[in-house]
Amino acid sequence: MGENGAKRWNFGANEVVERSNSLTIRDYLNTLINCLDGGDVRPVIPLGHGDPSPFPSFRTDQAAVEAICDAVRSTKFNNYSSSSGVPVARKAVAEYLSSDLSYQISPNDVHITAGCVQAIEILISALAIPGANILLPRPTYPMYDSRAAFCQLEVRYFDLLPENGWDVDLDGVEALADDKTVAILVINPCNPCGNVFSRQHLQKIAETACKLGILVIADEVYDHFAFGDKPFVSMAEFAELVPVIVLGAISKRWFVPGWRLGWMVTLDPHGIMKDSGFVQTLINVVNMSTDPATFIQGAMPDIIGNTKEEFFSSKLEMVKKCAEICYEELMKIPCITCPCKPEGSMFTMVKLNFSLLEDISDDLDFCSKLAKEESMIILPGQAVGLKNWLRITFAVELELLIEGFSRLKNFTERHSKNQP
């Protein structure tokens, strides 16, 4: 019996789940949404999460929509798929990724997942052996942190250096690693920093990972979202140096995150992952996981094959324009420093100068009051591992973006120590 004679039940909250959820972007966004003033009739400016698909300017290509409809009408994809995906989808992804490489990827190395997030879940679960640790960047995409916490895989953080264009602190990586380190994560183009790694820097990362005897996880969900001086280069180019697992999806480039179609590709030309047994472990975890909708998989050849380059180039030009406006407007706000002009993905990281602000205690307080006073959502940096910074999403309608920076400027002026 429980207190006061009440019946005691043998289930309840799971502390591991609670801790893991507290690391997610969604948890922070929900907190900020609850801060919004319901009496404010202005539209909410959503610069906190990376999903521009609701905006008319970022609708997907009609060819992709028709591919889905054709796959459904065909009735060929009403059945379950194999655990690693429908063969035509695996082949389509292999050919799509190979078009950027100096070699061909085998469809057998492609595993189709329910978005990139499921690929993360599968991979972290496979890596989480007792005593192991993984190297994650700081700042980071926190789904890796959350899943690692859930799987009780130790995380060690290496720094991305804003003064060096957010390049990896490779000396720090070597200092963190030991004989229990299993992998290093590289997100390129980078969420949350908005940088694109050069070919030379990627090679140095691969060489460092080889020296340490660890595999490279290459999160390339923003592949081809590069609009600065550096072209996108896949870490797959360095698979001869070190085992690489590439994660990706159609979510970002096609602006369809709700379709939940991603992939995980094992690049292991020397058989290192296979001989160690890790590939089989990965397949075993895949076998315990659910599959993406089969008709989405069946549509993949036509989604990839029928989407014209004009669609990609026009959308990328739009994102680039948004990035330029974002950077220009940030430079006008004294209490905010943007160390690097964004050149990839749809985000940038900026630092708050609290010496110029009053009544603001930290980045979460800043974002909470911004939501309440200006109906504007920006993600606090602590959500991505960098306290007292902000992650700003700029891929929205231009009118919303301009209005958002007007509100942000008004907010910072109102909370400035030097206000009249």
UniProtKB/Swiss-Prot annotation:
It catalyses: L-tyrosine + 2-oxoglutarate = 3-(4-hydroxyphenyl)pyruvate + L-glutamate. Pfam families: Aminotran_1_2. One of its GO terms (molecular function) is pyridoxal phosphate binding. Its cofactor is pyridoxal 5'-phosphate. The keyword Transferase applies. Pathway: Amino-acid degradation; L-phenylalanine degradation; acetoacetate and fumarate from L-phenylalanine: step 2/6. One of its GO terms (biological process) is amino acid metabolic process. Disulfide bonds: none annotated. GO terms for cellular component: cytosol; plastid. Keywords: Aminotransferase, Pyridoxal phosphate, Transferase. Transaminase involved in tyrosine breakdown. Converts tyrosine to 3-(4-hydroxyphenyl)pyruvate. Can catalyze the reverse reaction, using L-glutamate in vitro. Can convert phenylalanine to phenylpyruvate and catalyze the reverse reaction in vitro. This is Tyrosine aminotransferase. It comes from Arabidopsis thaliana (Mouse-ear cress).
